[in-house]
Amino acid sequence: MEEPKCLQREMYKSVMTENYQCVLSLGYPIRKPEIVSMMEVGEELWSKNDSARPGQKEVEGETPKESDWAAENCKRAQMHKEVLDLDTLAAVKSEPVEEGSNSAKKSHICSHYGKLFSCYAAVVRHQRMHQLQKSHHCPHCKKSFVQRSDFIKHQRTHTGERPYQCVECQKKFTERSALVNHQRTHTGERPYTCLDCQKTFNQRSALTKHRRTHTGERPYRCSVCSKSFIQNSDLVKHLRTHTGEKPYECPLCVKRFAESSALMKHKRTHSTHRPFRCSECSRSFTHNSDLTAHMRKHTEFRNVLNLDSVVGTDPLSSQNVASSPYSCSKCRKTFKRWKSFLNHQQTHSREKPYLCSHCNKGFIQNSDLVKHFRTHTGERPYQCAECHKGFIQKSDLVKHLRTHTGEKPFKCSHCDKKFTERSALAKHQRTHTGEKPYKCSDCGKEFTQRSNLILHQRIHTGERPYKCTLCDRTFIQNSDLVKHQKVHANLPLSDPHTANSPHKCSKCDLTFSHWSTFMKHSKLHSGEKKFQCAECKKGFTQKSDLVKHIRVHTGEKPFKCLLCKKSFSQNSDLHKHWRIHTGEKPFPCYTCDKSFTERSALIKHHRTHTGERPHKCSVCQKGFIQKSALTKHSRTHTGEKPYPCTQCGKSFIQNSDLVKHQRIHTGEKPYHCTECNKRFTEGSSLVKHRRTHSGEKPYRCPQCEKTFIQSSDLVKHLVVHNGENPPAATAFHEILIRRENLTRSEPDPYPCTECGKVFHQRPALLKHLRTHKTEKRYPCNECDKSFFQTSDLVKHLRTHTGERPYHCPECNKGFIQNSDLVKHQRTHTGERPYTCSQCDKGFIQRSALTKHMRTHTGEKPYKCEQCQKCFIQNSDLVKHQRIHTGEKPYHCPDCDKRFTEGSSLIKHQRIHSRIKPYPCGVCGKSFSQSSNLLKHLKCHSEQNPPVALSSELGFVAETQTHPDPVDHIVYGDTASYISPEAAGERSFKCNDCGKCFAHRSVLIKHVRIHTGERPYKCSQCTRSFIQKSDLVKHYRTHTGERPYKCGLCERSFVEKSALSRHQRVHKNESPVLNSAMEQQQVTYWGESKDDPNSLVPQLHVIKEEESPHIVNAYSPLSILQSYFPPILEPKGTPRYSCSECGKCFTHRSVFLKHWRMHTGEQPYTCKECGKSFSQSSALVKHVRIHTGEKPYPCSTCGKSFIQKSDLAKHQRIHTGEKPYTCTVCGKKFIDRSSVVKHSRTHTGERPYKCNECTKGFVQKSDLVKHMRTHTGEKPYGCNCCDRSFSTHSASVRHQRMCNTGRPYQDEEYENSLFYSADITWKGDYAQLLQIPCGLEEPMKAIGWISEVAL
């Protein structure tokens, strides 16, 4: 009986497995039934005690009963029947799955998760899984499960139990199936084979996913962008790109990741743990993918030993095999993977099977064709979430994202420098290692980059792939072809000399290619000079040389350049000059492939390769490449300066130096840039300038790879790395190499033995050596200051004599040095020759560009030794160090005040002298600082010039239609009216609200209002601020610092504006009290009696009868927003008058806030309750009502307040301070509002009028209460009887009566007993009292009210 049961069980297992395999073979995504999982791991299916299954335990101590076991088996059988119904399978088989079909052909969608199916029966079967009851609930996380086995597996995630252990590596697993899959990594078993490509897998799920690559099935679709995925996990990861969710956070550096695997890889960067070890060579890896790639080196090499015929090389050495098992027989390049090797071989066969249908361009790989095709379609599927920039390749997006994150993942192990790309790191590391991996097979020369090797090899092969279409001349580099083609622009030049030199001189071994040239040279040795000049008796060997010499006396220059009109005495000089315009260099060096414009320059250059120095100094035996260099050098020994200037008497060693000097007097600039038409006095300056257009930077720093246009900039930069005295070996090695490549030959440099610095000339070296010996031989007789060089002394003496020999022809301003004049003239011409390559910003001086470039590179080379703070400029470091030393070297002689900076002293002295040297050319207004003038100039529009207007009074200009509160502008006789359309340039616009600003910095601060960004955080209370200045002010609340002190009462203030407001109390200049003045004094600009062309401040008294004309004082609101208002005297007099109530204000901001009281404008709205406010500060305070925030605590009693002003008033209760005094009766008050209310008892003023009955009130709150008598509003309700009241006090009295049981008066009866009366004061606080009808004495009313209130 037992044997048939066993056979029946085996048959059941076989049928179930076959049915499940059938479904999988169709490519249908089906959830694996639990019974199939049990069969795969070898569990018993018919055990009556489920707890006896291996790996399962009893849950909460319960043992399943036999009835439960039977019900469970029935339930499972029903599930299997539903899932594996043969009729359904037949329906599935009836719909053939086409190869390459995708999810778009699956029209049946699951309503729960959106999963796609090819037939309706599959959807029905799938949806039954959602309808199953989840009866197993996890007590830890409330998760539910349909099957008990899934519930038991889930519980192990909470308990950490891993009952299945691998006997090979001791690794543990929660499920037996996971252990079986893992063991296949040791055995190498891959039992699941793809029928299409025969690829094998160790897990069935991997085969299922792989099958979808053949069928094109992508069952998981994104509901946002409709993109489909093969796996559900890929869809989950993709959805995070839409939501921005990064749920995995690193506990060490708080960095977040979208995937857990990325977090695991990242965590290993914090530790040295390498958990993945190679079993063959014991090498360890941080990531499993690295180990997998490494393992292929071992497994693929075993295969490559049998593929010698394919590889085409001899057996590889063990060293090469360990790294790259596949070697190319043509170029000897090695590869780690077979596929990469096959792709590479196609580059030699030039087979490009993938053709573009648009341009017929061929590609080796299909992926390259896909990327190329996007250049035609414009598709950029990879978009940056920060700036929405699109990219064709994902790798480009990854590199781009690093510009936003600042991430530089590739770090140099030598200098800790970081790079965004691995290739940049590889190139950089070669500067440390000196590695030159690209070696020439012909001459053994090595190069750091492959591109340089390719160019070099063309010297050996003779390959010149770039051909001129006009003259068939060929070139090694494309850049040489481009330069050559400029020759054909206008003038045809002669062919270059050949390299053949058959004629050799027996005296000096010089060779010549032409016989005539050789004969001319021979006469130099014979000394024969039969052609003599009649003027100076100088002799020449040839008549042509005499003709040329005579032109020196006559000044004749018959050869003229057609482009720049420059003339020359010889035709050869014209030809040489013409090459400056064409850029042609017809004389190439075959050693280094450098080209030259002249043959003589090539001969001199060639000596740098051979080391030949034929011209030696008889004094110091120093050798020189050129004879002219020896002649110049000899004058350093003799002190001879044979070339004097006829205008200033200055002498020079070289004639070229004299020519350059004379251009200072004549103003000649013969060197012309063809790009920007700029002219220069020296050819070297033009060469340097051209590099700003071409971007060439030939001088490279050997330490940081930074490049420079000039060698002097490199020398200055090297000080950053090596300090003030850089070693010669590291600092100037690169300079010497570049110097060999200069277009002109130069004598050997003079190195300093102290610091290794190199100089071109010996006098420069001698001057430099004095800096080490601290020898200053040139003292000043005026101030005893000494200098190293006499030129420095001459410049310094001009500061005493006041001599400024260099004058500007535009403004006649004088300067001590010519360089200062050159810089100044650029302010007139607008020339900015130094352009930033990053943002195209232009600068007048090179030093300004250098400083600006550091804002892009982040370089701060000047570090403070005390606090390690770094600065971009050395001057900033000097100023900063004064903070530590407390030094204030700049002293005011008038008030003995000291300053850390000279500019601060200059600005301060203008307070004493009242000098305002910066006048506005439009309106004549003057300013003490240039920055204020620049801000003011933006108020004037260039499109609408000012038009002078006048009235009968001579100073009032009226506007026609302006709804703004102020309608007039008051100026002097020569004042100009600026229309609202000319309201200043505001070129920076906010994209959110359309508001415009004159300065970019103001726009940046404004944008933070929309974004909510508050980058400045307080370290004491974690409060944040939009501006740094606000943080500084706030920090004083913690430190107690009050830097602004009143000179009259010794009171201190946190802000300067608070001090200004306080000082008005002493001067009796309250803007509120000034509104009652019968006449006002206004200062305006008028003509001076002494000089009609100048504007001076004039005082005008505005009388009572003139007030109708000027009650709407000074200027339209639109102009106020872009204008500096007219100067008002005396200081503190109100400048802004309200046209509605006549009230005057000193500050425009206070006036604008006041004006909103009349207009009712409330632009600031609360998002919580919709309430609006006229001021942003009121909104901020209101929001704290919702949040409950009270950031201002009292240090005495601990009570907190929403506003700082409330805290200040509260603290006066503890101190007893009453700083506000009534000027009439001398009574004192705690706050200013109390004294204002009190002052109305003297004046009888009632500013708050009721629109219904014209009744007046002293306080606005009384008006609000009164208005409820008209509207009937009763906002205060009783909690006991639902009765409502119009005032809070009435509600409080009523609730007391409800609580105590005492009767209460009817509110209408109470209101009928009262009428509004004068203000009566009790104690220190003003209270508005309502007097009962018939009671004349207010004090009796006070007693009556007190009695009722009790």
UniProtKB/Swiss-Prot annotation:
Pfam families: zf-C2H2, zf-C2H2_6
GO molecular function: DNA-binding transcription factor activity, RNA polymerase II-specific; RNA binding; RNA polymerase II cis-regulatory region sequence-specific DNA binding; zinc ion binding
Major place of residence: cytoplasm
InterPro entries: C2H2-ZF_domain, KRAB, KRAB_dom_sf, Znf_C2H2_sf, Znf_C2H2_type
Zinc finger annotations (C2H2-type) as residue ranges: 108-130, 136-158, 164-186, 192-214, 220-242, 248-270, 276-298, 326-348, 354-376, 382-404, 410-432, 438-460, 466-488, 503-525, 531-553, 559-581, 587-609, 615-637, 643-665, 671-693, 699-721, 750-772, 778-800, 806-828, 834-856, 862-884, 890-912, 918-940, 988-1010, 1016-1038, 1044-1066, 1136-1158, 1164-1186, 1192-1214, 1220-1242, 1248-1270, 1276-1298
PTM field: Phosphorylated. Phosphorylation enhances RNA binding.
SUPFAM superfamilies according to UniProt: beta-beta-alpha zinc fingers (SSF57667), KRAB domain (Kruppel-associated box) (SSF109640)
A GO term from the CC aspect: cytoplasm
Keywords: Cytoplasm, Metal-binding, Phosphoprotein, Repeat, RNA-binding, Zinc, Zinc-finger
Location of this chain's protein in the cell: Cytoplasm
Expression across tissues: Expressed in oocytes, and in specialized cell types such as neural retina cones in adults.
Domain KRAB: 1-58
Gene3D superfamilies in UniProt: Classic Zinc Finger
Region (Disordered), start-end ranges: 47-68
Protein task: Binds to poly-G sequences in RNA. May function in post-translational regulation processes.
Family: Belongs to the krueppel C2H2-type zinc-finger protein family.
Protein name: Zinc finger protein Xfin
Species of origin: Xenopus laevis
